[in-house]
Amino acid sequence: MSFDPNLLHNNGHNGYPNGTSAALRETGVIEKLLTSYGFIQCSERQARLFFHCSQYNGNLQDLKVGDDVEFEVSSDRRTGKPIAVKLVKIKQEILPEERMNGQVVCAVPHNLESKSPAAPGQSPTGSVCYERNGEVFYLTYTPEDVEGNVQLETGDKINFVIDNNKHTGAVSARNIMLLKKKQARCQGVVCAMKEAFGFIERGDVVKEIFFHYSEFKGDLETLQPGDDVEFTIKDRNGKEVATDVRLLPQGTVIFEDISIEHFEGTVTKVIPKVPSKNQNDPLPGRIKVDFVIPKELPFGDKDTKSKVTLLEGDHVRFNISTDRRDKLERATNIEVLSNTFQFTNEAREMGVIAAMRDGFGFIKCVDRDVRMFFHFSEILDGNQLHIADEVEFTVVPDMLSAQRNHAIRIKKLPKGTVSFHSHSDHRFLGTVEKEATFSNPKTTSPNKGKEKEAEDGIIAYDDCGVKLTIAFQAKDVEGSTSPQIGDKVEFSISDKQRPGQQVATCVRLLGRNSNSKRLLGYVATLKDNFGFIETANHDKEIFFHYSEFSGDVDSLELGDMVEYSLSKGKGNKVSAEKVNKTHSVNGITEEADPTIYSGKVIRPLRSVDPTQTEYQGMIEIVEEGDMKGEVYPFGIVGMANKGDCLQKGESVKFQLCVLGQNAQTMAYNITPLRRATVECVKDQFGFINYEVGDSKKLFFHVKEVQDGIELQAGDEVEFSVILNQRTGKCSACNVWRVCEGPKAVAAPRPDRLVNRLKNITLDDASAPRLMVLRQPRGPDNSMGFGAERKIRQAGVID
């Protein structure tokens, strides 16, 4: 657009305030400003006027959008449109003194002009906010409104004056002063988490800071100790707390610098296993390093590479960690050197891995008779141990139980290093003078208390005419039977690794003492490959294996009298050996009392209820009389039917008799009084309504029914109950029918069927009828049917 200043309707009159013109002047605001022209928004009327920059009286560089100006109105000769001429910038009014405090909401972008230069008179803007009467207001500002050479950032605290443009009504912030820069975000690592709050170890100072879970900006379920976070510190109730907590990528926060070089030193102070109450030092351990100037470095329980116990005097290798926050040095990545045992005063022992469990195991010791417990964490050099591996270790008392020992600092040894015995091939004969016993059965848990020590046995033997004795251990006996006093044995002599100590090994039983006492008993229980014998006093039961029975095991029956000897096997358990079936020579000492009593079983035999500790059963007299309430014991001999299984609470009839070597009055000839009804009968078996144990029904086979009677449901029967020793299940035998049950009466036809039949109308001619036109034909003993199958049309009869 071209403009000629001489084309104005002012006849060359200058029209400035100092001139003589009486033309009316108006005021307005620069709305748009370009290189050579611009536009003015009139203040007194709704008009927008063009002006040429040549009409401005002053430095054009000082003129910008929003400035108040005074001007005259003229008209363009070419277009006739009104234009503004003779522009004068109006001086700004004095700003009010009241200043507001606020905060930068959106800062003016940095380097905006270099990226996209603005046109003359146009400046980038930002926004600030302030609060008044609980309400927040937002204002714009430009870089020219900031006092001093200050670059504002979002979040900065500021002080400013509110400016209201009377021409446009726009409100903005002017004379902005920076009060406080926004606090930088801090970083740290979550070190502890409680129910509703946690603590962060700060990355700038050696200090922890509290934070509430409501301040965590993210999924709280994913937050866990060790996570890197950033946060803002605020003051609440006089204490610093972390707010606006956010997760950082793992590895962002680094507290310390670890040296690449490895150092060697000596442990001068170990970390106590049980810290004292007044111990506040987080790094209680000490390692001495021989630098030019000797120095002691602290270390904590997390600075060791493994959980192997450290001892004073240990030679170790480590790195030095320097804390970035306070420059504190400490030893870390500590590992025990292989030659450390040359400098410590510990007594090392050897053994073989005997058992491995989940996280712990047991070592068979060369110099100890008990197996030594150890934790996997005590294995040196990160080796993985297996059963039969040879190891070296140190024995220390358990911190939780001083009566127990356990192995620490376990080092794997080459195969063939550990030797339990060095014995000759020469065999000796001797006689047992003292029996050897085992320790308590081994447990898989280290927290069962102190185990009982095993006791050595003594063997007397003759060597070149000299009578000598030698010790032997129960674990060195061959076979399952332990030798007893007076038994003849064969053995070898071995030198253990303990200096100057000889023991008998490979001990084999040659013969029992001929003077050993033979005992009588009665077969009480028969299992698959073992059984139990009731003693002659009828108060205990003795285990025996079928391999100890002389004769055909199938010929043994419950109640048979047997003769046996006692022996102690592994685990100090007493068992019967050399069991022989004998005749009843020392049975009942007196005739049974002919009086028959009625009673109730208040405790069954142990073979019926294995959970009870007592072997004998007990019967209480229930019939009226002087003896009512008296209780008498019974055993397998007292049963009329030795295979009968008496349950607690069953009614019985019995006699009294003096039995056993101690002449004890016991129940004898016990017969149960059982009556019940038949529940149902299948093909070859049935069930009786009788409760035994957890079962409400009692099984019986039809071959157990006496006299070949066919039982029906509802029949009342008497029977005996036998216990299958192999399966542990009970069944009925010797089933007698006492009386027949009620005959089954045909049930009447249900009413619904009767009503349905009544509603059928046979005379209804319209009802559908089914008529048989041809009976089906079967095969005629030929190679198929004579009539060929053809495709027929439905509903059409040939």
UniProtKB/Swiss-Prot annotation:
GO terms for cellular component: CRD-mediated mRNA stability complex; cytoplasmic stress granule; cytosol; Golgi apparatus; mCRD-mediated mRNA stability complex; P-body; plasma membrane. InterPro entries: CSD, CSD_CS, CSDE1, CSP_DNA-bd, NA-bd_OB-fold, SUZ-C. Keywords: Acetylation, Cytoplasm, Isopeptide bond, Phosphoprotein, Repeat, RNA-binding, Ubl conjugation. SMART domains: CSP. Residues 748-789 form the SUZ-C domain. PROSITE patterns: CSD_1, CSD_2, SUZ_C. It is found in: Cytoplasm; Cytoplasm, Stress granule; Cytoplasm, P-body. It comes from the Eukaryota. GO terms for molecular function: lncRNA binding; mRNA binding; RISC complex binding; RNA binding; RNA stem-loop binding. The modification Phosphoserine is found at residues 123, 276, 514, 584. The modification N6-acetyllysine is found at residue 81. One of its GO terms (biological process) is stress granule assembly. Transmembrane segments: none annotated. Residues 26-87, 136-179, 186-245, 297-337, 349-410, 447-507, 519-579, 610-670, 674-735 form the CSD domain. There is a cross-link at residue 91 (Glycyl lysine isopeptide (Lys-Gly) (interchain with G-Cter in SUMO2)). Pfam families: CSD, CSDE1, SUZ-C. The modification Phosphothreonine is found at residue 761. RNA-binding protein involved in translationally coupled mRNA turnover. Implicated with other RNA-binding proteins in the cytoplasmic deadenylation/translational and decay interplay of the FOS mRNA mediated by the major coding-region determinant of instability (mCRD) domain. Required for efficient formation of stress granules. Component of a multi subunit autoregulatory ribonucleoprotein complex (ARC), at least composed of IGF2BP1, PABPC1 and CSDE1. Interacts with STRAP. Part of a complex associated with the FOS mCRD domain and consisting of PABPC1, PAIP1, HNRPD and SYNCRIP. The interaction with PABPC1 is direct and RNA-independent. Interacts with EIF4ENIF1/4E-T. Belongs to the UNR family. This is Cold shock domain-containing protein E1.
